[in-house]
Amino acid sequence: MLGIDIIKNIRIAKALERFGYHFLNRVYTEYEINLCKMNVECLSGRFAAKEASIKAFSFLSIRRFSFRDFEVVKSKNGIPELRIKDAYINDFLKAQKLKPFISISHEKEFSVAVCYITKEERIC
């Protein structure tokens, strides 16, 4: 399952200007708000990652997802990781041996993200 999203960073800047913390709290977790510190590129990348994740997870037909169902965290080595906030979904993924991965990139005024969900397989 695959989801992709691209966003013009100015859209996030305008949403911040117009709606402020109401927008932030509707889309981002406290961790993400603290991590990005109002950096538009950081917030745009996470927005794109959440949109891509919603698209990828929609193929599972479990339920409808929202932005706050997902949290984009930094791994120990700086790679973005997707954290799912719903215990039921985590249990479902574990039972089906599915693992989501995300990638975020920025180019000039755009941020793009991909989420793909793959079967966990042991190698050996």
UniProtKB/Swiss-Prot annotation:
It comes from the Bacteria. Mg(2+) binds at D5, E51. It catalyses: apo-[ACP] + CoA = holo-[ACP] + adenosine 3',5'-bisphosphate + H(+). Its main location: cytoplasm. GO terms for molecular function: holo-[acyl-carrier-protein] synthase activity; magnesium ion binding. Pfam families: ACPS. It is found in: Cytoplasm. Disulfide bonds: none annotated. The keyword Magnesium applies. It is an enzyme of class 2 (transferase). Its EC number is 2.7.8.7. Belongs to the P-Pant transferase superfamily. AcpS family. Transfers the 4'-phosphopantetheine moiety from coenzyme A to a Ser of acyl-carrier-protein. This is Holo-[acyl-carrier-protein] synthase. It comes from Hydrogenobaculum sp. (strain Y04AAS1). The gene is acpS.
